[in-house]
Amino acid sequence: MIRKIRYLLFSIFLAIFFMNSSFSQTANKFDFERIEDNSFLIEEAYNQDPGVIQHISSFQYMKDHSWLYTFTDEWPVPGRKHQLSTTIPVLNNGTSGFGDIALNYRYQAIYMTRFAFSPRFSLLFPTGSWQKGLGSGVMGYQLSIPFSYLLSTKIATHYNLGVTFTPDAKKADGSKFDQTIYNYGLSMILLLNKNFNFMFEVVGNRTFIKTAGTKTIITNSLFINPGIRYAINFKSGLQIVPGIAVPIGVGSSNGSSGIYAYLSFEHPLWKP
């Protein structure tokens, strides 16, 4: 099942890439105001506009009483081509505290009216307590490949592939292991109008854990995440986007569910 989804995503990426050359013929039709870069579990491929910064809060509460809050700050450096951001997590998995903080760099390789591509590289700093199971205890590395494609004037789509590698991570008992996580996802967003969207996301991952002298442990997760978002725009340039969704486990994650809340503040800080 997961392998088929990966092949499907890869095929979609190739199709979108080779359609690139024809986009200019219909560019004007798709050049309209809409909500961008405000997805929930999926990463959209749009960097910040020059001079505009974004502050994002998200909170996810699951049926097993675990929860995760993240705060992300995104800054153009100094324009759209390069972007730096930080993500600070606070979580509860039986005990509460800060997780491992991420420093992210994203490059806007392609930005067209209908298509965008912006690969991201992240460093995961060991700020969470590995003794409490809140962090890895070592530096981690993450690569993400997000694509965004405007399918029509009413439907936007986004596609993600990524990998996270944490060598010599520490368990609470002090033992070490290597962890590799492959993630994938896609979303379809119905643009009802410029300020209100219906969203449907699918996200999954496959995790490999290798400890000394043991076989590799493999686990999978797969969630669908239907939701809505709404943009509130001010004359000053401030945009506030609240959103809510319901993550539902399917396949190997069947029986797991929760609630997801999102809030973004985006505003100009300087004139480019």
For each of these PLM feature ranges, what is it?
Residues 25-272:
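Transmembrane beta-barrel domains of Gram-negative outer membranes and organellar outer membranes
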